[in-house]
């Protein structure tokens, strides 16, 4: 019986060592770090719009020449749903939003916009327009802005002098 007891003891010891080897658990924590960034984008315009000298009668008769500027929207990564809006610095527009007030009585500017893939279209101020939709592009969108001096509706243009105005260009994207 002693031999049987010794044999059972040896078997139990071996089994307990085997179970503890199989049942051992080790854990290690793995650090995870992430930096989430919104793509950085820049809006570039190639020049200011300078009409120099314009005759009052050319503005009143709609014969004044338009001037244009190129716009580029560059991002360090692809962005979607790019929208653009032109906001007059004077915050005044005609009732149909097609003419911005210059800040000088009777003088305004009409606006046309062209995406790189299309021709010019008359557009309103203070309204968002789609710049990208299903168009394929590689982190760069191009467009053109065209302004023309015109009579501001409901006001008489009779005063001469230098005029400085601004347009704020707002671009929104996802």
From Swiss-Prot:
Signal peptide: 1-21
Name of protein: Protein FanG
A single GO cellular-component term on record: pilus
One Pfam family matching this protein: SCPU
Keywords on record: Disulfide bond, Fimbrium, Plasmid, Signal
Localization annotation: Fimbrium
Marked site positions, Required for stability and transport: 173
One annotated GO biological process: cell adhesion
Top-level taxon of the source organism: Bacteria
InterPro entries given in the database record: Adhesion_dom_fimbrial_sf, Adhesion_dom_sf, Spore_coat_U/FanG
Role of this protein: Involved in the biosynthesis of K99 fimbriae.
Disulfide cysteine pairs (residue numbers): 41-75
Organism from which the protein derives: Escherichia coli
């Amino acid at each position: 019986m002693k031999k049987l007891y010794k044999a059972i003891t040896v078997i139990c010891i071996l089994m307990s060592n085997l179970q503890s080897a199989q049942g051992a658990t080790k854990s290690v924590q793995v650090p995870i770090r992430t930096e989430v960034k919104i793509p950085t984008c820049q809006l570039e315009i190639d020049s200011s719009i300078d009409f120099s000298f314009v005759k009052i009668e050319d503005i009143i008769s709609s014969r004044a020449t338009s001037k244009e500027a190129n716009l580029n929207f560059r991002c360090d990564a692809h962005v979607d749903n790019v929208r653009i809006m032109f906001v007059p610095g004077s915050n005044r527009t005609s009732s149909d939003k097609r003419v911005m007030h210059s800040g000088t009585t009777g003088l305004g500017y009409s606006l046309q916009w062209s995406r790189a893939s299309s021709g010019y279209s008359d557009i309103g101020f203070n309204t968002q327009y789609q710049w990208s939709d299903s168009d394929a592009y590689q982190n760069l969108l191009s467009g053109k802005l065209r302004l023309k001096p015109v009579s501001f509706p409901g006001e008489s243009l009779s005063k001469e002098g230098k005029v400085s105005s601004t347009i704020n260009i707002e671009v929104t994207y996802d």
